[in-house]
């Protein structure tokens, strides 16, 4: 059976929506919000009615009959840690999204708007594989400092989507495979997927792992402590070096990996040195995650925007193909991944989880 779905993915200055019939996109729109519009609201939750109205108006303009929808799917927000999967949006989830139990983020509005529209139409509302997806093995949580446990913050939606896609295309099923999935975008996450669970992954936001176009990844801890107490930097400035101004931005003042590779190929030695370190660190992280899986790796998967690179992918393959064969699913399609999560539940392939 084919279901019509409205997908809602709120970002800080835009709301991306898509209408799908099954896995086929009928249309997609990015609704941009000006600073003036956003500034009117004190909190992210205060933007709820405004964003909902904008979405409904666009659907009306497109003469789309919302009564034909089977379900609404929102981007999962900063909830309490949960295992991966598709969740029915309930009142407890909405309350946690309102207050942002793990921090304020525009994606918190995804589930709230989805439930509001879904309830009015008397159809289900879901979120899929939120960024707080946490399936870490207990042994992976210990960092070496009791007050600083390792956290699971990664590109869960895309990592899970491509892992399940490979499971389907290979005919083996995600739950029967050991995979190392590497998402390469503004941040880089390398996850060990053990029979359907991400048992270890670097905290790709502000934790550890390879550096990325904008993030520092793991850094020498003693020197970081000295930097914090040197009196030269505020907390925000140090954090900025980790997130936003780390990685390629820190070294080369750009987050454009393709541009860096182009310069390297024209003979720029500094670009070459940073690029080689980038490849080295990602390869090292893949090796680390293959040890987590005790060397039993069925496939390594590269995904995210940087996986389009005709230079980087072969360079990474050369370093890691001895561990396992490599599959490349470049880019990320968050709206489709959200649609697929809902379809698996509506088709009875998976059960909706309860928050």
Swiss-Prot record:
* Keyword flag Kinase: yes
* One Pfam family linked to the record: Acetate_kinase
Q: In which pathway does it act?
A: Lipid metabolism; butanoate metabolism
Query: By its UniProt entry, which InterPro entries does this protein fall under?
Result: Aliphatic_acid_kin_short-chain, Aliphatic_acid_kinase_CS, ATPase_NBD, Butyrate_kin
| An annotated GO cellular component | cytoplasm
Q: What is its EC number?
A: 2.7.2.7
Q: Name one GO molecular function term.
A: acetate kinase activity
Q: Which UniProt keywords apply?
A: ATP-binding, Cytoplasm, Kinase, Nucleotide-binding, Transferase
Protein's cellular compartments: Cytoplasm
Task: Extract the signal peptide range.
Answer: none
Q: What does this protein do?
A: Catalyzes the conversion of butyryl-CoA through butyryl phosphate to butyrate.
Question: What is stated as this protein's family in its record?
Answer: Belongs to the acetokinase family.
**Other facts:** Also acts, albeit more slowly, on pentanoate and propanoate, and on some branched-chain fatty acids.
| Name used for this protein in its record | Butyrate kinase
Species: Clostridium beijerinckii (strain ATCC 51743 / NCIMB 8052) (Clostridium acetobutylicum)
